[in-house]
Amino acid sequence: MTLTIKIGTLNDSDQSAVHNGTENGSDFRKITPTEEEICDDVVLLWKEEPGTEDATIQHLYDRITERNQSWKLSASRFRKILNEHHLYDTDLETVSLYKDKIHFPKALDSDAKVEVKFIDDEHGRGLFAKRDFSKGQIILKENKPIVYIPPLDKLFLISNGKACARCGKALYDLTQHKIMVHYLDCEVCKAIWCSEKCKKAHASLHELLYHSWRSNRIDILHAGNWKRFVNYCEKYCFTAAFSVGLIYGSMLLDTTGEVKEQWQKLASISQRERIKLRDASGIGSTFSLLNGTTVHTEEESDNGTKKGVEKNIDDETVWEKCYELFCGAFPKASEEIDFEKFLTMIGTFNINQYNGQVYHWISFINHDCEPNAYIEQVEEHEELRLHARKPIKKGEQIRITYVNPLHGVRLRRRELRVNWGFLCQCDRCQNELSTFERVPNLEKKNADANLGVEKIDSNDSSEDGSKKSTGNRKSSMREAQPDLKEILKNGKEFELDIPETVDTQGNVRKTSVRFDSNVSVAVDER
């Protein structure tokens, strides 16, 4: 037996035959991408390579066509689509916003450490400190969300007793003995809870949603129709609608009225208003997938024989069907919740949720790209702790960041515009915006088919300093990062600028990572 070491490639890195238009000697047919696919890949590129966010549109076009060599895409169409979807606006101040359509209830709240104050009609309310806080100090704790929402993608595991019926935690370490001793399983179905705490908090809601016939609660909820509603939400990844269903069910069970009271204090907006600003719809979209904005598709048969062909369904159709199933699950819901109010409940959840949950105090905190506070999530995404990121004085507004602070100003503001309806005007945004060489809209309109934007070499510069590459500007948080694109090309070993770790001996260590497109494989030749 002979053992031979061969060098192979990773992740289809060597697909030149396909990319060059041939595969196995035959012509490789190019496809025309949809507007959504183009927008998705542009935003995905920005997230993967933040430096390209500031690139010229010509360079952006080159990168997209390089990434998708099977696409048939002209430069003029590329530019037109990006302009229509506001993905290459040099002046985002002119684009549509929906902040003026958000309703802010006048309800305020306070405790010993913080208080909610009304700022103005534009900014709504904010959370303010009632005492001084030092850096790193815990400002407040929220032990639980208004209603706990299990992850939509874990419902299959939950229904089969493989994950907690309340929190979705995997149950691989839960023994049958513990389940029996602590009565952690449902008497009727396969549902299991991970702890007595989860069962106590969720058992009554589970009974209503899935076994309403046992407690004669069919008048307020039909268990069979609830399952149909949940299945529809799963099919279209409609997390917000599923969450609204759980919240409404909790309101019906809550004899204290606390759930409804806290929900009514939230800022609200119709999902119809939010969807108008969606710039893309897939994995690269700046419109958060958690916010119920995935592409809606369903399988279509061809003469009853061929299945699996997908067709797009517009949002309105999905909303209407979802509302119909919602009313079927809750027979009396239509008396107080019409279709428009249902959409408002969905929009309300989306603009107030934090990692899929709605928390009372956190929902009042406003955004800043250089915040003075940050959130720590503990106990399986249930408890939240708000820490001071820097010293906070009494009377100062407490702010967190809604978006990734390492993103460039354009991507940060675009995500804020689409997901929360406003453009950030913080000092950091203003400073970064001032570094851009703004291109007048008139010039964009008069650009010819070759995009009319000159490609600038990042190494070129003029004596007066007037010719600068927009790609040279980087946020202060990432200016020391290496050029990963060049490093990956060369397949060299390098050190990433990541937090240092301390071992048990007190020695500080860094992690070295090697990126290469090749892999060594031992082949048994017989």
Curated annotation (Swiss-Prot):
The keyword Cytoplasm applies. One of its GO terms (cellular component) is cytoplasm. GO terms for molecular function: histone methyltransferase activity; S-adenosylmethionine-dependent methyltransferase activity. Pfam families: SET. Residues 450-492 are annotated as: Disordered. Keywords: Chromosome, Cytoplasm, Methyltransferase, Nucleus, Phosphoprotein, S-adenosyl-L-methionine, Transferase. It catalyses: L-lysyl-[histone] + S-adenosyl-L-methionine = N(6)-methyl-L-lysyl-[histone] + S-adenosyl-L-homocysteine + H(+). The keyword Nucleus applies. Present with 5000 molecules/cell in log phase SD medium. Histone methyltransferase that monomethylates 'Lys-5', 'Lys-8' and 'Lys-12' of histone H4 (H4K5me1, H4K8me1 and H4K12me1, respectively), thereby controlling gene expression and remodeling chromatin structures. Functions together with the chromatin-modifying complexes COMPASS and NuA4 to regulate cell growth and stress responses. (Microbial infection) Acts as a virus host factor involved in the replication of positive-strand RNA viruses like the MBV. This is Histone-lysine N-methyltransferase SET5. The gene is SET5.
